[in-house]
Amino acid sequence: MSINLTLDIYIYFLNNARSLCGKQRSKQLHFVCSKQYWRMNHVNVHREFHTSKKSCKWNRSEAHCSKHWHSPSNHGLHFGIVRLSTSAPKGLTKVSIHMSRIKSTLNSVSKAIFGSQNEMVTRLAQFKPSSRILRKVSDKGWLKQKNVKQAVESLKNYSDKSAGKNSLAEQKSYFADKEEDSGKHSLFHYTYGITTRFGESFSVLANHINSYFKSKGKMSQTKEDKQLQDKPDLEERKSSSPGPDTVADRPDSESPLEVKDKLSSPTQMPEAHPVSAKQSIANFLSRPTEGVQALVGGYIGGLVPKLKSDPKSPPEEQEVSAKTEQAVNKDKKAEEKKRVLLQQEKIIARVSIDNRTRALVQALRRTADPKLCITRVEELTFHLLEFPEGKGVAIKEKIIPYLLRLRQVKDETLQAAVREILALIGYVDPVKGRGIRILTIDGGGTRGVVALQTLRKLVELTQKPIHQLFDYICGVSTGAILAFMLGLFHMPLDECEELYRKLGSDVFTQNVIVGTVKMSWSHAFYDSNTWEKILKDRIGSALMIETARNPACPKVAAISTIVNRGQTPKAFVFRNYGHFPGTNSHYLGGCQYKMWQAIRASSAAPGYFAEYALGSDLHQDGGLLLNNPSALALHECKCIWPDTPLECIVSLGTGRYESDVRNTSTYTSLKTKLSNVISSATDTEEVHIMLDGLLPSDTYFRFNPVICENIPLDESRDEKLDQLQLEGMKYIERNDQKMKKVAKILSQEKTTLQKINDWIKLKSDMYEGLPFFSKL
């Protein structure tokens, strides 16, 4: 690779008086000839003037020197030239120079895009030594104004006209040096040594780079200027004293061969020191043939590692892919092994559960003592509560016939324990009337006093308590409270209404400020802990399934909404019964929960009480999904009594408010939209319309009075509750015929044929597997 040294100033010495200055390309250049490169024939000066042209070319291994002798006596011109630039001439190779520059630029861009980062770093490292040489040469002697003056003064003896021209060259050189010194203040500037013309784009790029690096290089530039001002004498002495870097001041005894040896010696090469960041761009641009290449390569090279990663060799890629595949296979094997182990554990657990169930059933069948039977029955009950999948094994072991026969024993405690385990397994007794009778109560807070007025009228017409009128009672939120008080605790309506009002006054009394703080903290205006404490004191900690011990208790359910299973809320049924194995309900639920937990979960209205966590499920008010549980109750009854017809469904609402004001606006606000969404979720009339159209006539009865005021759920003032009670009574009076029809249906007794069928079914279940006559 050839190394080109470019000088900012060239000095010509012309012996001809016509011209002192020469032109190279578009710039006026001056050259001076050293004594070692020319000689004069002292014998006959006018006859012949011998000059020698010294051309030097350096590369990495050697330096080539050549002499060209000229005898221009015909032209009367005698000159000697020293040229330390090996840049391409302007003559015949002009086109090839431009093409090589374009080719170098394209090669640099292609290498920046497709090459690796290491190749770019190697490419940039090659520019630094030449830039160092350029700085060293330009600073030492040839660019200094005083050296030019000394060279011109030493040549005054040959021509007087040359002296005048040399003064002109001196002024040109002075201004050139001044421009160079002023250009040093900018990081990116144009020097006269650059032979490549950039045009307008060069100025735009230079201004952009100088403005970007100006703040960073300000301190170092100030320090450098100060050092130059403090040592002017030292620079002057260095420029005037002979040195190895100044060609014009070399001694005469030094031959060109010695110069060649020194330049070819690797130990005499100038040491390449790291160049500062503010000078690196100028050094790249100072190279006439590779300036653009260095500039493009220097700026794009830093972006290539970010845009393109280093290509990996095929063995490395294969090794990485093999490791990745091995890791994936290892994970798959571990996952498969874990799945197999889990499956084995489930199988072992299921086998152990089945074995435990068989052992308990066989132990119960071998027991003859009534007291020991109670213990065995309770053990089996707790086992099936913990592992419901064991019910199928117990049925296969003929547990139902034995329990039915055991229920005939005259022991109330044993009979209660047997009724509980039969309800848990899913065995049910026949219904009370001619068909299934269902009572459902909507949610609505303290507006439940409206439903109490309807129930009071039914009790008055039938002369029977509520728990004897219906086979299945289901409620949501406040309706669940009424269902438990009437169906499980068998409270009279007067006592139930009094307790209902007391619960409202105890729970729905809260300071506004305290409630607002609680709302922001737990999203509940009222104290949920107080509500839980009241429920525990009033209801107790008995399990739902334990209520089946009482033969007079109907099937009771409370509805809540699970909000953390899947993307949509799901209804959850707290039951006091279990489904027979093989019967699948559409709704989640269980009978192993406590009664107060069921009411707490069903009444967790958002904004009023905090949501209730029960196990891994998060429960909220059932009214969010099914505020009218009539359809759910009908489905559950079909699962319990699949072969029994439906006699009637009585659905009780807590009052509805319908405004006659019509909004004529063409759009609705966000508040109105949210209110409509909430109203549609808690709407009860759509279910009523659906069931009324699907069920047979005189089967579905809905009682939901229209109230004149939109009373909130947490209303606890007595005057407002009395107003609701009065509106409920007026509604009953207007629908007196409808109430009488319901009372008549509920008062009907079973026919004789139905009673015989029930007796036969009981005997067949009790003596399953025995001959027919033994069942009688």
UniProtKB/Swiss-Prot annotation:
GXGXXG, short sequence motif: residues: 443-448
Phenotypic effect of disruption: Mutants display multiple bioenergetic dysfunctional phenotypes, including growth retardation, cold intolerance, reduced exercise endurance, greatly increased mortality from cardiac stress after transverse aortic constriction, abnormal mitochondrial function with a 65% decrease in ascorbate-induced Complex IV-mediated oxygen consumption, and a reduction in myocardial cardiolipin content accompanied by an altered cardiolipin molecular species composition. Myocardium of mutant mice contain more oxidized cardiolipin.
Stretches that traverse the bilayer: 469-489
Glycosylation sites: N4, N157
Tissue: Expressed in myocardium (at protein level).
Domain of life: Eukaryota
Alphabetical UniProt keywords: Endoplasmic reticulum, Glycoprotein, Hydrolase, Lipid degradation, Lipid metabolism, Membrane, Mitochondrion, Peroxisome, Transmembrane, Transmembrane helix
Catalyzed reaction equations: a 1,2-diacyl-sn-glycero-3-phosphocholine + H2O = a 1-acyl-sn-glycero-3-phosphocholine + a fatty acid + H(+); a 1,2-diacyl-sn-glycero-3-phosphocholine + H2O = a 2-acyl-sn-glycero-3-phosphocholine + a fatty acid + H(+); a 1,2-diacyl-sn-glycero-3-phosphoethanolamine + H2O = a 1-acyl-sn-glycero-3-phosphoethanolamine + a fatty acid + H(+); a 1-O-(1Z-alkenyl)-2-acyl-sn-glycero-3-phosphocholine + H2O = a 1-O-(1Z-alkenyl)-sn-glycero-3-phosphocholine + a fatty acid + H(+)
Residue interval(s) of motif DGA/G: 621-623
Comp. bias (Basic and acidic residues): 221-239, 247-263
Pathway involvement of the protein, from the record: Phospholipid metabolism
GO cellular component: endoplasmic reticulum membrane; membrane; mitochondrial membrane; mitochondrion; peroxisomal membrane; peroxisome
Residues the record lists as N6-succinyllysine modifications: K730
Residue span, PNPLA domain: 439-634
Enzyme Commission no: 3.1.1.-, 3.1.1.5
First and last residue of the signal peptide: none
Primary role: Calcium-independent and membrane-bound phospholipase, that catalyzes the esterolytic cleavage of fatty acids from glycerophospholipids to yield free fatty acids and lysophospholipids, hence regulating membrane physical properties and the release of lipid second messengers and growth factors. Hydrolyzes phosphatidylethanolamine, phosphatidylcholine and probably phosphatidylinositol with a possible preference for the former.
Protein name: Calcium-independent phospholipase A2-gamma
Organism: Mus musculus (Mouse)
Organism placement in taxonomy: Eukaryota, Metazoa, Chordata, Craniata, Vertebrata
Gene name of the record: Pnpla8
